[in-house]
A protein has these predicted regions:
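Transition segments tied to proteolytic processing and entry into folded domains
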Residues: 1-128
Length: 128
């Protein structure tokens, strides 16, 4: 997942807009984030805009203003579009206390990890 990511960061959604493309273009949703923790391809405090194919939104991949997320994003395509690596696996929810909700695999209870601890573990893994 780390290897396939062009950008890895924790951030807050500050704007969501659907672009009005030319008639022959792909419909795109543009999401703007404020980076809170930068791992790869961005800087802390940076305002980052990504463009996703609007079809992801119909499949349930939606963002809300004020939402805190941790993202593993593919490098932008030739069209400038990106998406989370591994689909939903590349997008983790974060609460207001900056704890990341880990998706349960074997148990029914989601566990959390502090953003700082998760970021440190990712940085170590990226060096290996």
């Amino acid at each position: 997942m780390i290897r396939d990511s062009g950008e890895i960061f924790a951030g807050t959604v500050i704007k969501v807009e659907r672009t009005d493309p030319a008639p022959t273009s792909t419909i795109v949703t543009q999401i703007t984030f404020r980076v809170e923790e930068a791992i790869r391809g961005v800087r802390r405090g940076q305002i980052v805009q990504i463009r996703e194919w609007a079809g992801l939104w119909q499949a349930g991949e939606q963002y809300r203003v004020g939402e805190h997320v941790f993202l593993f994003l593919y490098p932008p395509s030739k069209l400038g579009l990106t998406s989370p690596v591994g689909g939903p696996s590349g997008r983790l929810q974060m609460d207001d206390a900056h704890k990341i909700r880990l998706k349960p695999v074997a148990s029914h209870r989601a566990q959390t990890i502090r953003l700082k601890d998760f970021a440190a573990a990712l940085r170590r893994a990226a060096k290996e």
